Amino acid sequence: MANIPLILASSSRYRRELLDRLGLAYTCVSPEVDETPLAGESPVQLCARLARLKAEAVAKTNPHAVVIGSDQVCDLDGQALGKPHTFEKAVAQLMSMQGKRVVFHTAVCVLSPVLPPQETISDTVITMRALTEETVRDYVEREKPFDCAGSAKIER
């Protein structure tokens, strides 16, 4: 399998950083996937579906490559919290998590031309302590988590 190209089906700088740590040669292709949750879909189902869709979207045009698709969904009381994209939405998401159990589902799907698909989901569970709004705003200003599920940078 040494001659099979490896493609990360993502535009996420965080996923690139994780793959860089392994020292593997790979390329990135940003998949075009509709990330809208389906009716009745749980956060963990959404996460698994998106990881697979991302891998499949890239594998269609790269059938001879190993393709890694991944997604992360923040699950607060059974509701998926997406990327906030704005300062105020990030503050609101983080304020809503205080004192609650929050699950970050991370799904990975690996598609290969020579092996069956491999899929897994890993959960990171946190309980957000009580924070002042000023502290939350300072965090959002400093970290700018606008592209992170649930406004939390938990990769570090």
Where are these regions (language model features)?
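Anionic-ligand binding patches
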Residues: 2-7, 20, 43-156
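N-terminal G-site helix/loop of the GST-like fold
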Residues: 5-29
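Short glycine-rich, Thr/Ser-proximal phosphate-binding strand/loop in the N-terminal lobe
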Residues: 23-40, 117-123
